[in-house]
UniProtKB/Swiss-Prot annotation:
Gene name in the database record: rxt3
Protein's recorded name: Transcriptional regulatory protein rxt3
Any one cellular-component term (Gene Ontology): Rpd3L complex
Family membership noted in the UniProt record: Belongs to the RXT3 family.
Species per Swiss-Prot/TrEMBL record: Schizosaccharomyces pombe (strain 972 / ATCC 24843)
Keywords of the record: Chromatin regulator, Nucleus, Repressor, Transcription, Transcription regulation
Record text on subunit structure and interactions: Component of the RPD3C(L) complex.
Biased composition (Basic and acidic residues): 1-25
GO terms under biological process: transcription initiation-coupled chromatin remodeling
């Protein structure tokens, strides 16, 4: 058994958690002077408190006084705290967690605020279903404030259904064209006399029919070359120089009459020659225009001093190879290009 001496008791002192300022002291050889500690645990708070408690004015002015920093290790680890915190307490460690907590508090406060609002409808809405025979309230009218979304962002994310209106399609009105007054003139001559045309014409954009009053009921024949059935070459196809429907004025363009009646399309190339037979009829009091086959004809309501034209028959024949096309096969490429250049400069292809 060892005897209890004041020196042994002083050497066996431990670190008191209540007093973080005291340092463990050991005495050797009966001396009471403190020796350099080997393992001293200090916190930043204990160093600052010990500096303030010291009554030495020089110690307080110089901050740490004459303390030898080499003898005291730096407190690199987290300060030791002996005050136990409750384990249930949760503190946000980042800015995003703090922001989430604040958003959650705002949502809870808005829900409480909405619960306190009155859920009853106004007098007008109640009167809407009060009279006998009134329709029952829909589910949309009976929705309470509590069932509505509390967060505005979630409500905006939902797609809103808009009423879909029926698209109206434009349909051109049906226009009745009555040309029955001209039927007696079509059967005026027997079939034997109506086999051959009165005269034949070669079509050009500047063709003008003479006044054929003596040939009413008969027909004329017009031959149209391939190049005049092209809207890029024939300027009259783009000017809508056509008056009437089925029965046209004599100053209407013949190529445009064929396109209006659907004999050929302006959107497709034509590779054959058109031979058109046209009835010669008396003038009408009124020529009504319509839109057919991407071409809109014009109307004419005043008096006309010419004749009327109506398509009898349209035949297509293949284009014969010209002398130029037959002789060009024996030429070289340079000679072909030169021949085409000279032909393009001639008056034949000028419009």
């Amino acid at each position: 058994m060892e005897e209890k001496t004041p020196e042994n008791e002083q050497s066996k002192k431990t670190f008191d958690p209540k007093d973080s300022m005291k340092i463990e002291e050991t005495s050797t050889n009966g001396s009471s002077q403190p020796s350099q500690p080997s393992n001293i645990k200090l916190s930043i708070g204990s160093i600052l408190e010990s500096s303030n408690d010291n009554g030495d004015p020089e110690y307080s002015e110089n901050g740490m006084g004459n303390m030898n920093m080499n003898t005291l290790p730096m407190a690199t680890s987290t300060p030791m705290s002996y005050t136990k915190q409750p384990s249930e307490a949760k503190y946000p460690n980042s800015v995003w967690e703090r922001k989430g907590v604040s958003d959650q508090e705002e949502n809870t406060s808005s829900v409480k605020r909405q619960k306190t609002l009155p859920t009853q409808s106004s007098g007008e809405e109640e009167a809407k279903y009060s009279h006998p025979g009134a329709p029952t309230a829909t589910s949309a009218d009976s929705i309470s404030m509590e069932s509505r979304p509390s967060n505005l962002s979630t409500s905006l994310s939902k797609t809103t259904s808009y009423p879909q209106f029926q698209v109206r399609q434009f349909v051109s009105p049906i226009i009745s064209i009555d040309n029955s007054a001209l039927e007696p003139f079509l059967n005026r001559y027997p079939a034997s006399e109506s086999l051959f045309p009165v005269t034949e014409y070669e079509y050009t954009p500047w063709l003008e029919f003479p006044l054929l009053y003596s040939s009413i009921g008969k027909f004329v024949r017009v031959t149209i070359d391939i190049k005049w059935l092209n809207a890029a070459i024939n300027p009259r196809l783009c000017r809508r120089e056509i008056w009437g429907t089925d029965v046209y004025t004599d100053d209407s363009d013949i190529a445009t009459i064929l396109a209006h009646c659907g004999c050929f399309s302006l959107l497709k190339p034509v590779r054959k020659i058109a031979v058109v037979d046209l009835y010669i009829l008396p003038p009408l009091v009124h020529y009504k225009g319509t839109r057919k086959n991407q071409i809109e004809s014009r109307s004419w309501s005043s008096r006309q001093d010419g004749i009327s034209l109506k398509i009898k028959e349209v035949t297509w024949k293949p284009a014969c190879a010209s002398i130029f096309e037959n002789s060009i096969h024996t030429l070289t490429l340079e000679e072909r290009l030169q021949a085409r250049l000279e032909l393009s400069r001639s008056s034949t292809f000028k419009i």
